[in-house]
């Protein structure tokens, strides 16, 4: 099932038809199929090899596999997943015109966030557009991941290299189940400068 906020806001970032869309720390998200169905070429990046296998198994697709340095490239049609460390991926391996982050940056502790921004910047061409979905909650109420990523921190981390626009913030209903007093999700449009 596709993420509701992706379906609602993808058109807002105005990604070019056929754009190569980067999906960092993609796991086995079905959102990649949805983006592919919109006419995009998808490049996911995932550290856990089992998640890559599960993605293609669930899609009932057998990918071509090729070793590229420290990464393995799994390709089936317009979908590619590079299995390996996002932070060691060379820029030319995933040069993208658009990107989608539903759970990547919130999976990282605060000490790794600037490195993440730097790597996204290096993997995207100037003018690239991104859609990022974050979570915010009182961090002391839950260890994470997902970690809390307040809107102000997103702006501070990206502002020097991206034009940042907050598209929407929604109150999530499952905060009580997680033992949280409040849980929000924000959607950002980011344009690489």
PLM region spans:
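A short, conserved alpha-helix within the catalytic core of class I
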Residues: 107-119
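A short acidic, Gly/Pro-enriched loop at the edge of an enzyme's catalytic core
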Residues: 91-99
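Class I SAM-dependent methyltransferase "Motif I" SAM/SAH-binding loop
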Residues: 22-29, 104
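Short active-site oxyanion
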Residues: 19-21, 40-41
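Conserved catalytic-core segments centered on acid/base and nucleophilic motifs
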Residues: 32, 42, 99
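Gly/Ala-rich phosphate-binding loop of Rossmann-like dinucleotide-binding domains
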Residues: 36-37
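Class I (Rossmann-like) S-adenosyl-L-methionine-dependent methyltransferase catalytic domain
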Residues: 1-18, 28-31, 44-91, 117-119, ...
